[in-house]
């Protein structure tokens, strides 16, 4: 019997007690929905397999003492199939012990779950166990990473790549349609600074300092070997296309008929660098994401909001709702009407759009697209955007939407890369930062994704490179993957020994270690649902670590394959073999049941790792 089945049983009993007049003043309307009646795993196994606080939840509403209400609940539970014992403890806890067959039913539930319909999209051989449809019918637009196209993706963006894709997988496993989206900031001042930095690198490489070109990186520009690389690539591409950058540079130096400068010395050549370099960075970012196993459905270009008139249209929409006014020569969004701490400029007095104007248009576009319009727009932003939440939520409300429902903003905190207790600055291309490609080259995709997804994104996080590269139990990803590989090895040894679980009697899974593994397996569906509802994919990783620990402990105390057939230390010594066979080897029926349990663990670990975008290895 699963925890969910127990919750449904408890809910049914609550309604029956109301009907029978055994629940005091409690009415059907006062009974919480089933998902609010979750059972818990007691810390002390002497208190049973599961515990419920239903009596304490409802006692005040019933006008009864918790223990007095718990007694009829316990009596009804004790009559249910699959329950061996029920006790009322403490102030009103109800402790439930399942019979061995009922507890072991989860094994069949895991292995009988059908294959996923989109198997080609999954890393591992996953099935439907744990998956549900409680978010079905919703289209969620999940925007993440969205790093500026002015350099390689740094470690902060890498964290969002791992967390965002894991979150998308978790949401999809709960029935939602998820649109993974990358917002490509190819409009605005950061692009100008990028182009200026490239021109400076090009000018220095071509000795154009004497011609009036700045050869030093602007103080607000971008540095790193990648700038020199891209500048050289732009020059080579331009020359291949018959464009003479030096000639453009001289053209920039031209004067008008009055002998006055036509403009900044690098206007034309800077535009040439911009239009060529931004697509180069776009291609590089796309490749980094693909190599990191993150496949976006939409690559949205900020520039298109202006080119397609969407910024003007969104502002007109807000104006029609009475939320736009003019002051001091500028156009303002009256965001204070909707909870913001101050009103926001959207068109500056010089006629230029403020950055927030694009944000307004972008949200409106997400919600009203011809295809895949978002019921919920989820933004995953860095810690430096915390002050942006108020104006974004105000804008959501101004459009008639519900902040927190139609728009959700998740803030991620900083990541530090450490080795031997010291911060690491290992990028040769990007200067004083760590990039996604740097991290992957050192620890691999699996370790990078798992380590970044296993921690709460709302907390600062240190990555220990030495730990992630190690093959020890202290390395979380190794520990979980090894559990899967170990279970595969059990299968191979069982096959060699002629052991099969066909027709296995799962009621024989009656030891304490068996029970711990069974309970862990039973919790996966609720963990997956909670991870989706809370937007916290790290809960899947932490669950996998607990399951792996439980499995490793079980493996060490409960044999599946006879030791004499697999352990080198028993070979060639008949007496030793006999002694070990008597002491360690299970009878065939129990071995079959344990093999089936082994394979259920294997399946759940494969399912869970797949949700994190991490492989489940056959061998290690």
Swiss-Prot record:
UniProt KW keywords: Aminoacyl-tRNA synthetase, ATP-binding, Cytoplasm, Ligase, Nucleotide-binding, Protein biosynthesis
The keyword Zinc-finger appears for this protein: no
Signal peptide: none
Transmembrane portions of the chain: none
Pfam families, per the entry: Arg_tRNA_synt_N (PF03485), DALR_1 (PF05746), tRNA-synt_1d (PF00750)
A Gene Ontology BP annotation from the UniProt entry: arginyl-tRNA aminoacylation
Segments carrying motif 'HIGH' region: 147-157
Catalyzed reaction equations: tRNA(Arg) + L-arginine + ATP = L-arginyl-tRNA(Arg) + AMP + diphosphate
Principal subcellular localization: cytoplasm
Gene Ontology CC entries for this record: cytoplasm
Its EC number(s): 6.1.1.19
Gene Ontology MF terms: arginine-tRNA ligase activity; ATP binding
Enzyme class: ligase
Top-rank taxon: Bacteria
Localisation: Cytoplasm
Family to which this protein belongs: Belongs to the class-I aminoacyl-tRNA synthetase family.
Assembly mode: Monomer.
NCBIfam families: argS
HAMAP family in the record: Arg_tRNA_synth
The protein, known as: Arginine--tRNA ligase
Organism per entry: Bifidobacterium longum (strain NCC 2705)
Designated gene of the protein: argS
């Amino acid at each position: 019997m699963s925890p969910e089945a127990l919750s449904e049983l408890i809910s049914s009993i609550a309604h029956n007690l109301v009907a029978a007049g055994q629940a005091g003043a409690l009415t059907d309307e006062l009974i919480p929905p089933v998902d609010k009646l979750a059972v818990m795993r007691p810390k002390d196994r002497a208190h049973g397999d599961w515990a419920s606080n239903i009596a304490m939840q409802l006692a005040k509403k019933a006008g009864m003492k918790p223990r007095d209400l718990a007694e009829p609940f316990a009596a009804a539970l004790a009559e249910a199939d699959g329950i061996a014992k029920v006790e009322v403890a403490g102030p009103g806890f109800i402790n439930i012990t399942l019979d061995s067959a009922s507890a072991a039913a989860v094994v069949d539930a895991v292995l009988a779950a059908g294959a996923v319909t989109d198997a080609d999209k999954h890393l591992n051989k996953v099935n439907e166990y744990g998956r549900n449809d409680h978010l079905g019918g919703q289209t969620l637009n999940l925007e993440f990473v969205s790093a500026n196209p002015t350099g390689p993706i740094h470690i902060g963006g890498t964290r969002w790549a791992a967390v965002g894709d894991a979150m998308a997988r978790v949401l999809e496993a709960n029935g939602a349609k998820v649109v993974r989206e990358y917002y490509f900031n190819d409009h605005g001042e950061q692009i100008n600074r990028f182009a200026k930095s490239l021109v400076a690198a090009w000018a220095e490489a071509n000795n154009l300092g004497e011609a009036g070109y700045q050869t030093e990186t602007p103080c607000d520009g971008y540095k790193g070997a990648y700038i020199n690389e891209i500048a050289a690539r732009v020059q080579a591409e331009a020359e291949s296309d018959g464009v003479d950058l030096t000639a453009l540079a001289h053209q920039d130096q031209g004067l008008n008929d009055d002998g006055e400068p036509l403009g900044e010395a690098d206007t034309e050549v800077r535009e040439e660098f911009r239009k060529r370099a931004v697509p180069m960075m776009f291609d590089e970012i796309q490749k980094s994401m693909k190599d990191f196993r993150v496949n976006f459905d939409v690559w949205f270009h900020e520039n298109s909001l202006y080119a397609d008139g969407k910024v003007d249209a969104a502002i007109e929409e807000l104006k029609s709702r009475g939320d736009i006014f003019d002051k001091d020569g500028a156009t303002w969004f009256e965001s204070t009407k909707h909870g913001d701490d101050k009103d926001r400029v959207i068109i500056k007095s010089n006629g230029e759009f403020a950055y927030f104007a694009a944000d307004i248009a972008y949200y409106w576009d997400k919600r009203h697209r011809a295809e895949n319009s978002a019921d919920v727009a989820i933004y995953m932003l860095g810690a430096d955007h915390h002050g942006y939440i108020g104006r974004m939520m105000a804008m959501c409300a101004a459009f008639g939407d519900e902040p927190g429902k139609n728009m959700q903003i998740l803030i991620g905190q900083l990541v530090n890369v450490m080795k031997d207790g010291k911060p690491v600055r290992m990028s040769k291309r990007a200067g004083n930062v760590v990039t996604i490609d740097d991290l992957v080259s050192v620890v691999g995709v699996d370790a990078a994704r798992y380590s970044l997804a296993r921690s709460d994104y709302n907390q600062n996080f240190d990555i220990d490179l030495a730990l992630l590269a190690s093959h020890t139990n202290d390395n979380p990803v190794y520990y979980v993957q090894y559990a899967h590989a170990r279970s595969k090895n059990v299968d191979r040894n069982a096959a060699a020994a002629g052991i099969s679980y066909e027709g296995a009697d799962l009621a024989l899974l009656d030891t304490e270690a068996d029970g711990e593994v069974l309970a862990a397996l039973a919790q996966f569906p609720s963990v997956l649902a909670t991870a989706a509802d809370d937007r916290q994919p790290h809960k899947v990783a932490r669950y996998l670590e607990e399951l792996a620990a439980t499995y490793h402990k079980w493996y060490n105390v409960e044999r599946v394959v006879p030791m004499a057939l697999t352990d080198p230390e028993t070979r060639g010594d008949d007496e030793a073999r006999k002694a070990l066979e008597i002491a360690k080897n299970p009878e065939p029926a129990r071995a079959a049941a344990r093999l089936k349990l082994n394979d259920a663990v294997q399946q759940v670990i494969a399912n869970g790792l797949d949700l994190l975008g991490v492989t489940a290895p056959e061998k290690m």
